């Protein structure tokens, strides 16, 4: 599925007509729900193009890939449950939330925000290749956060388990690591840390 913003809202479904006939799309309380009346064949291939005026949240359950090339809005929450993946392009959101439950992933080329909250308490992964935020808040388990080139003014990190994180903090880093997790930070922030259970916190140099 590819999601874009536009003046007119629309949903286009492409694929085998016999498979499309089992797909339902309903709107309840301003939430679009796309589901299937029955189990789809393993070899079925469907693609979706969704255009919305204002995007405030996306929930991906189980398998699948959702692409959002660009998005500009005040508040947005993106959630992946299971092994699915979200591929993001240039995202400009004041208050942004990423939630990964399971072994899914969220990957972004660029994020610009005032506040970004990332929650990934399972084995999922979040990757941000560029952009900046004022406040980055991370709640991590055994998964991964890769943001060495994502500039954050302040970083608050709470890691429980054997996860791995790379962060770039300019002013302040508040890190708590419980377990065998590993954190690499870039920049020269003022630091407050609590490490137990064999965890590691090390500097990767200034940027």
Task: State each model region's role.
Residues 1-81, 88-99, 110-117, 129-137, ...:
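Acidic (Asp/Glu) and glycine-rich low-complexity loops/linkers
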Residues 132, 137-170:
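Glycine/small-residue-rich hydrophobic helix-like segments
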């Amino acid at each position: 599925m590819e999601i874009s913003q536009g003046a007119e809202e629309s949903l286009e479904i492409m694929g085998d007509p016999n498979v499309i006939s089992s797909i339902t799309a309903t709107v309840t309380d301003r939430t679009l729900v796309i589901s299937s009346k029955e189990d789809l064949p393993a070899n079925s291939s469907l693609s979706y193009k969704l255009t919305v005026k204002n995007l405030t949240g996306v929930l991906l359950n189980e398998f699948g890939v959702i692409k959002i090339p660009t998005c500009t809005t005040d508040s947005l929450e993106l959630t992946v449950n299971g092994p699915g993946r979200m591929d993001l392009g240039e995202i400009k959101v004041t208050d942004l939330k990423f939630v990964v439950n399971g072994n899914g992933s969220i990957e972004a080329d660029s994020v610009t925000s005032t506040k970004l909250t990332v929650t990934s308490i399972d084995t999922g992964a979040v990757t941000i290749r560029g952009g900046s935020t004022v406040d980055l808040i991370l709640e991590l388990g055994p998964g991964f956060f890769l943001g060495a080139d994502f500039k954050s003014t302040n970083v608050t990190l709470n890691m429980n388990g054997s996860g791995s994180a790379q962060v770039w903090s300019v002013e302040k880093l508040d890190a708590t690591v419980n377990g065998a997790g590993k954190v690499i930070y870039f920049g020269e922030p003022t630091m407050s840390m609590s490490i137990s259970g064999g965890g590691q916190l090390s500097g990767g140099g200034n940027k």
